[in-house]
Amino acid sequence: MFVIACKFNPVFPFIFELVAGIRLFHPDEKIVVVDSDSDDKSYLGILREKHGVITEDIANKNWMIGAYWYVYKKCPDEDFYYFMHDSMKVKANLDYLREKDLTLLMTFERGIGGYNGWAEAINNETDYDYTKSGQGCYGPIFFCKNKVMKKMLDMGADKFMPVTKQDSHYGERAYGVFLEAQGYDLLKCSLYGDVLEEERPTGRSGKYPHNTSWQYPVEKIYASLVDKKRL
């Protein structure tokens, strides 16, 4: 199952290219799009009629993490989940990722940047220690077997919901904590390695405004560079 959080802007309708790519390489796979309280929701009908997408018009205000948990709790028995942003492209079949428990798009050192605002709450409200050393889950964008999400639910990860852009940065780091606590080496689980390294002038994405066309078989576009509503 593909699970996509979408804040639709008709000027930059990234979701259409993403869903078309998924359907090209996964014609029979379930696709669920969760609307994040978009002003224009006309796209939902287009996705249903043209691509057979399951749409959830729930006025989601909890960013990507809110969309992921909404779908997981509604559909808890899927074997595998591809958790994505709408500003992505699928360029090939992704079935091979099902062979692994967990694949992250990219990582980064979670101690960098100071976005550790959920640390105290996680330490107080779960049985797990939030450490600033380790990897964050960029996005968070990840693809995983059911057991990974079931364990995160058992860990209490669903208690922590972003409501602001800053909170979404906290979530990237928190999910690094929860996934590492399950025993996963996130660097080894990552498709493309460290996002900050790739954003350097010598990295594959290069310096601002960053070119991600090299990413294959799935690409994350820096949508906020063109769609200022995402800032």
Protein language model annotation of sequence segments:
Residues 1-231:
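ER/Golgi luminal nucleotide-sugar-dependent glycosyltransferases, focusing on the catalytic module
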